[in-house]
Curated annotation (Swiss-Prot):
Effect of S20A: Impairs effect on cell proliferation
Protein function: Part of the CASK/TBR1/TSPYL2 transcriptional complex which modulates gene expression in response to neuronal synaptic activity, probably by facilitating nucleosome assembly. May inhibit cell proliferation by inducing p53-dependent CDKN1A expression.
Subunit structure: Interacts with histones. Interacts with CASK. Part of a complex containing CASK, TBR1 and TSPYL2.
Tissues with expression: Ubiquitously expressed, with highest levels in brain, testis and heart, and lowest levels in liver and pancreas.
Source organism of this protein record: Homo sapiens (Human)
Additional detail: Synaptic activity down-regulates TSPYL2 protein levels by inducing rapid proteasomal degradation. Subject to X inactivation.
Segments of skewed composition (Acidic residues): 509-519, 559-602, 627-675
Protein name stated in the entry: Testis-specific Y-encoded-like protein 2
Family membership noted in the UniProt record: Belongs to the nucleosome assembly protein (NAP) family.
Length: 693
């Protein structure tokens, strides 16, 4: 076995007898230590078949047969692994070597100087020849020479075998350091790439978060500004609504005055309404004949809710003269209803009559008393926004929806067992007409849904504080340009001017009529005073007593409270106007001054309206007298029509009940004749009872 720490043994030569013995040459210097070189990557290594072919070709070029391949002449480097031996030789161009070395197989002694001493460019400048040889595993032990090379140069180390010439063999360990290094570098690159990606994602996330935060902040600022504008608009709407309510108050009072002298006005209006008539049964219809007035009033604040008041005459069903149903909004914005308890006479309760009447559950008064019905709010909205806004619309209908519905039910009963024949040619026309009717019904529903009553409420119970009015004025006037205030001011002035023109002309005409015919008015009053015992006049006065004056006596307390509320609201409105003027003086804005001018104009207009209302009272007295005279003349006609309608709608039973009621009314009217005669004097001076307008 070769020992690397021992030097190669010297080759002995045979001496002839004639030659004299010479001295032995000096031993070569010790070889440098072995260096371990890594193998090339597997993809760069030649295959076994290619190695054997290359070794055979090299052997043929050197003139050697097909026998075992001999190593090339030194200097060369052998790389051996797994039975494959590779020879690396330097060409003749390399300095420090003879050209005869290639053909002589080590005949010339190896150079004393090592390749390690050569500089790097000289060591790598020569040509490189590679030989391959396949050897057996046992031949590895017989190799004589071992030489190592490094990255800088060649460092030969020879183990000389006595049978073979000098050889340099490099043993390479099987460690894939290049592969590991490449894998490490690829891992580093992947890590760097991932770090960069994570960094980019983090930066983009932070950028998006900052951008979204800025967008949300801008949206929040806009929403806050919009809410501030909405608050100002709401307060301005409330202020404008109060003004229009005050403007409409005298007209509503006139309307109530006229309606109270029309017999059966409200019962007919309720029965002709298509949605409310569903709740009115036969008994409710009898009760509604005693209804004299209907009022819809706001609560202390408009946004809090409203209440409905129903005024009745003395009737055999209950003792209440006024029943009130109040709708108030809670914190969640839902309407919560409350009503005054109805004090029924004995035996007239709806619960006692429910066993004998199946229609008792569908009753107007059961809805009035029950606060858990889901349709209660809807019915109240219909009464407030539709019926009370324009009751004349439903009063002037020829037949009520209740009669039409009964006719339709009768037709259905008659044609229930019959077959209907439809001609296919006329079918498109039939469907077209059906679509037209459906569109008309949709239009009617949309018209009913319009809340005209937003500007129609009475302000009998409307109260505001000075602080609220000043806050509203400050919020409306502050931070607004005068250009924005000019448009609504012009509109309000135009409306006021137009209203002044129409109303003043009408009122002047009526006043002229009164002035032209003062004698006629005096004659009428004289006739009434001269003939107190006239049957026609007594009946007319009885009509006043039963139709209006009796209800006036019952509603005296409510009118007093209404007048007190009117005075309080007027005082508060005046205080609010003073607050407006003070705010305008402090701020110095044009918008405040314009608002104060509008308030002054409104106050002047209200004063004119009140004066006109006082002037028109004489006309109303004439109208009342004419209505009373016409009612006396048309008594027989109305009774005949009433009997026909009762026979058609309710039958003979209802007719007899209505006659009994009228007889009772006549008896009570005859007993109170003296009170009735004072009715015209009571209506001649309506302003003495309280402040109007």
């Amino acid at each position: 076995m070769d020992r690397p720490d021992e030097g190669p043994p010297a080759k002995t030569r045979r001496l002839s007898s004639s030659e004299s013995p010479q001295r032995d040459p000096p031993p070569p210097p010790p070889p440098p230590p072995l260096l371990r070189l890594p193998l090339p990557p597997p993809q760069q290594r030649p295959r076994l078949q290619e190695e054997t072919e290359a070794a055979q070709v090299l052997a043929d070029m050197r003139g050697v047969g097909l026998g075992p391949a001999l190593p090339p002449p030194p200097p060369y480097v052998i790389l051996e692994e797994g039975g494959i031996r590779a020879y690396f030789t330097l060409g003749a161009e390399c300095p420090g070597w003879d050209s005869t070395i290639e053909s002589g197989y080590g005949e010339a002694p190896p150079p004393t100087e090592s390749l390690e001493a050569l500089p790097t460019p000289e060591a790598s400048g020569g040509s490189l020849e590679i030989d391959f040889q396949v050897v057996q595993s046992s031949s590895f032990g017989g190799e004589g020479a071992l030489e190592t090379c490094s990255a800088v140069g060649w460092a030969p180390q020879r183990l000389v075998d006595p049978k073979s010439k000098e050889e340099a063999i490099i043993i390479v360990e099987d460690e894939d350091e290049d592969e590991r290094e490449s894998m490490r570098s690829s891992r580093r690159r992947r890590r760097r790439r991932r770090r960069k990606q994570r960094k980019v994602k983090r930066e983009s996330r932070e950028r998006n978060a900052e951008r979204m935060e800025s967008i949300l902040q801008a949206l929040e600022d806009i929403q806050l500004d919009l809410e501030a504008v909405n608050i100002k608009a709401g307060k301005a709407f409330l202020r404008l609504k109060r003004k229009f309510i005050q403007m409409r108050r005298p007209f509503l009072e006139r309307r109530d005055l006229i309606i109270q002298h029309i017999p059966g006005f409200w019962v007919k209006a309720f029965l002709n309404h298509p949605r409310i008539s569903i709740l009115i049964n036969r008994r409710d219809e009898d009760i509604f004949r005693y209804l004299t007035n209907l009022q819809v009033q706001d609560l202390r604040h408009i946004s809090m809710g409203y209440k409905m008041k129903l005024y009745f005459q003395t009737n055999p069903y209950f003792t209440n003269m006024v029943i009130v149903k109040e709708f108030q909004r809670n914190r969640s914005g839902r309407l919560v209803s409350h009503s005054t308890p109805i004090r029924w006479h004995r035996g007239q309760e709806p619960q006692a009559r429910r066993h004998g009447n199946q229609d008792a559950s569908h009753s107007f008064f059961s809805w009035f008393s029950n606060h858990s019905l889901p349709e209660a709010d809807r019915i109240a909205e219909i009464i407030k926004n539709d019926l009370w806004v324009n009751p004349l619309r439903y009063y002037l209908r020829e037949r009520g929806s209740r009669i039409k519905r009964k006719k339709q039910e009768m037709k259905k009963r008659k044609t229930r067992g019959r077959c209907e024949v439809v001609i296919m040619e006329d079918a498109p026309d039939y469907y077209a007409v059906e679509d037209i009717f459906s569109e008309i019904s949709d239009i009617d529903e949309t018209i009913h849904d319009i809340k005209i009553s937003d500007f129609m409420e009475t302000t009998d119970y409307f109260e505001t504080t000075d602080n609220e009015i000043t806050d509203i004025n400050e919020n409306i006037c502050d931070s607004e340009n005068p250009d924005h205030n000019e448009v609504p001011n012009n509109e309000t002035t135009d409306n006021n001017e137009s209203a002044d023109d129409h109303e003043t002309t009408d009122n002047n005409e009526s006043a002229d009529d009164n002035n032209e015919n003062p004698e006629d008015n005096n004659k009428n009053t004289d006739d009434n005073e001269e003939n107190p015992n006239n049957n026609e006049n007594t009946y007319g006065n009885n009509f006043f007593k039963g139709g209006f004056w009796g209800s006036h006596g019952n509603n005296q307390d409510s009118s007093d409270s209404d007048n007190e509320a009117d005075e309080a609201s007027d005082d508060e409105d005046n205080d609010g106007n003073e607050g407006d003027n003070e705010g305008s003086d402090d701020d110095g804005n044009e918008g405040d001054n314009e608002g104060s001018d509008d308030d002054d104009r409104d106050i002047e207009y209200y004063e004119k309206v009140i004066e006109d209302f006082d002037k028109d009272q004489a006309d109303y007295e004439d109208v009342i007298e004419i209505i009373s005279d016409e009612s006396v003349e048309e008594e027989g006609i109305e009774e005949g029509i009433q009997q026909d309608e009762d026979i058609y709608e309710e039958g003979n039973y209802e007719e007899e009940g209505s006659e009994d009621v009228w007889e009772e009314g006549e008896d009570s009217d005859d007993s109170d004749l003296e009170d009735v005669l004072q009715v015209p004097n009571g209506w001649a001076n309506p302003g003495k009872r309280g402040k109007t307008g």
